[in-house]
Amino acid sequence: MLKKFLAKLGKGAAKVDLQFENRPYGINEVVQGEVILKGGQVDQQINKLAVKLMMTVSSKNGQSVSRQVDEIPLTGPFLISKQEERHIPFHYSIPSTLPLSRNFVSYYFDTHLDIEGGFDRTDIDHVIIAGSREIHSIFNAFSQLGFREKATSGKLDTYGQEFEFFPTQLFADQINELEIRFAYMGTGIKIWLEVDCRSNYGEIEAKREFVLSKELLENEDQLVDFLRDSIAETVQQPQLYGQPFSYHVQQPGHSGIGSGIGSMVGGLAVGILGAVLLDEIMDSFDMDEIFEDAEEAIDTDDDDSDFFGMDFDDFSGGDD
């Protein structure tokens, strides 16, 4: 009787442990593993066993919120005997429209063992969601062109996820910042490219969008050449590329996700968090950028020889 009473309080109760290979997982990739159940000091009735994928979005000011992305049911009701051990297979395919893990976007699996008449048991396991092989190829190509990802890259909005880069080599005297978005298309990867070009009259925003074919994505040298030529063409005549992006035209008022633009990376975020909550969290980034831009302008006026007018410690990215 005492053991049953203690088990209801959690002492000597059944335990749960999700195990899978600890590495980054690309979108559309399958996480495979198993859940190990170990019976406690007494027989216990289990109502269900399920694993939830949770997403946490944080802001610079420390505000954060976690929401359920998906739930993977593993069992219905069953009885686990005293000291019994069970191994239950687990697999989950990462959705293509999830935001990628970045400084302010993270994920974890919450394994939940629902014990009848007692304290439920949980197991938390963090997981990194990375880009697909094709997106890795694009990131690597930008890296070869001297672009480094900013610390605030990966911000979310009601369309999806935006990745921000700054130049360190080839285009350092022509570009302030480069921003990109991705979407999976049947023929390859669609990319939206916004280039903040330097000019004698201030900054000019140029917008380009094109589809990188599967064949191009498989050839690293050709991909680098294509992106280099596209960026060079853009900075030479930025005034020719002032039209709004197609997803702005197709989705007036930011009212929907995925209409006519394929599967934009990060597009699932607004459905998980809600547009209002997402906007509130991301507002802190917008204010930080306003102050950073003001500081950059002041520093540039004080010292024209210092191109960026900012501390590179504010950024993080790939290896130089």
List the model feature ranges, each with a label.
Residues 1-99, 103, 108-263, 279-320:
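N-terminal leader-region detector that preferentially activates on the first domain or presequence
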Residues 263, 267, 271-278:
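Hydrophobic alpha-helical membrane-embedded or membrane-associated segments
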